[in-house]
Amino acid sequence: MTSTRTLRYAQVACACIWCLFSAGIIFGFAALKPILISEGVYHELCDPKDGDRLLCTAQDLKLNFIFALSATVTNIMALPVGKILDMYGPRVCGIIGSCLLFLASGNFISAKHLVSLWDPYLVGYTLLAVAGPFVFISCFQLANSFPQRSGTVLALLTGSFDSSSALFLLYRLLYQNWFPTLNVSRFFTLYLIVPVFILACQLTIMPHSSYKTVNHIAKIAVEGLDENGRLIEGDTGSGIIPDEQERQSLIAIEREEDSIPSRPQRRKSVLETYVEDKLQKKSGGIFGVLHGKSAYEQIKSPWFYLMLLFALVAMLRINYFIATVRTQEEYLLNDPDLALKLNSIFDMLLPLGGAVSIPFIGLLLDHTDTLSTLTILFTTSTAIGVFGLIPNSFTWNLIGIVLLVVYRPFYYTVVSDYSSKVFGFDTFGTVYGLLSCICGIFNMSQNLLDKWTHTTFNMNPFPINLTLVILTVVFSLTLTFYIRSQILPKPVNERGLSSNYQTI
């Protein structure tokens, strides 16, 4: 028993380590970009008339395109990776991710030799983006390795993902301050340790099959119950039902129902009914509105496509800023030194934002109804956009950056939480995966916005940012008004439970 527990500790620890060094490293692009510029990547695209300028428009657009494509690909991959995980298990996903990291590193290591065949920087960075979901999503099943601490395990994995963008920040600091000869090729030669580590873990200590599917993990995280609506092994239920007398009464009823011969179709257990009724009230009437519907019916609903519209703009704004933070701040502050300072602050705060804010985000979700949480999300998103419109103010732009690094993990967590509560757990992987996939495809428009900023607007980010702020406000208000119109008092039956939920 002890050895099994030790093994599961080791599994979680190893997963956190490799997520920290591979899951979301592409989002550290703002820190990597100065190194690529210094190494002369794509400098051949510059017109000789540009002189000895370190960065020209064509080069900047091509570098930003690398990130735009990678951010698109990593979001698109969420849907197929979830399916592969459920079909073939976490070991296969982890090994695929490891191989992709090998290939990505190989492109950077041999870039000078491959440049005549294809674009090794674009291919390499895109492969890093594809690898991320494979090595990250395959870890979700570990949330049930310690059933009573599934939320803690998920928080550790999510924190590791959010902090992984720090890898390129560390590289930039080493490159600029101590090891100027540590070029991209040498760095990724050292980076080969990461895929080797992942592969070794997958072939030795990591589980071959999932403890649970992605949908089951979502149910455990939200309800604290397993896929059959039962208490998780080893859980007394005190966290779900604080009152001991009430808890023992419900558990007794549960045991009595368990003795009844099984039915062809599973119906909600007594505990499941109790928990979901509490969640329905706690969420302000949002929990369960589309539970039991098919994925197709859910996708046709305004609950899906109105959230999708907001998510499209939100994700685009986040990734567009990551790619263009330096050039935006140079224009707004009209001071390259201050812009560089803000860029450096952003590089440091981005990985810290997720790690620091995750516990507070959890507390907010636990103690605030869903509509209020969405209102906070919408307000924060709008505020960040407004601060990004203020010229000649280091302070306001700094506040906007601080809000953005906290908002990024907040956005992802709230959209995921909304999806599980509204659409349910049976279709969670499909519906949430589709939402992420569509957002990823739409993210390619980031490249068009960047081109317009460089050419049409002469580096002025104001028109693009203002448009995105207006769209944010419109879509936020539309979704808010729709939710308010749909939340109606639910009839309560004689047992005191909402009629939405079917008991045994």
UniProtKB/Swiss-Prot annotation:
Protein localization: Vacuole membrane
Transmembrane region(s) = 12-32, 65-85, 92-112, 120-140, 151-171, 187-207, 303-323, 345-365, 386-406, 422-442, 463-483
Top-level division of the source organism's lineage: Eukaryota
Give residues where Phosphoserine occurs: S238, S249, S269
**Gene Ontology MF: a single term:** transmembrane transporter activity
Q: Which GO terms describe its cellular component?
A: fungal-type vacuole; fungal-type vacuole membrane; mitochondrion
Topology term for the membrane? Multi-pass membrane protein
All ranges on the Cytoplasmic side of the membrane: 33-64, 113-119, 172-186, 324-344, 407-421, 484-504
Q: Which residues lie toward the Vacuolar compartment?
A: 1-11, 86-91, 141-150, 208-302, 366-385, 443-462
Record's keyword terms, sorted: Membrane, Phosphoprotein, Transmembrane, Transmembrane helix, Transport, Vacuole
Which InterPro entries does the record match to this protein? Answer: MFS, MFS_trans_sf, SLC43A_AATransporter
Entry keyword Cytoplasm: no
Task: Name the PANTHER family for this protein.
Answer: PROTEIN FMP42
Entry similarity comment: Belongs to the SLC43A transporter (TC 2.A.1.44) family.
Q: What is this protein called?
A: Protein FMP42
Organism field: Saccharomyces cerevisiae (strain ATCC 204508 / S288c) (Baker's yeast)
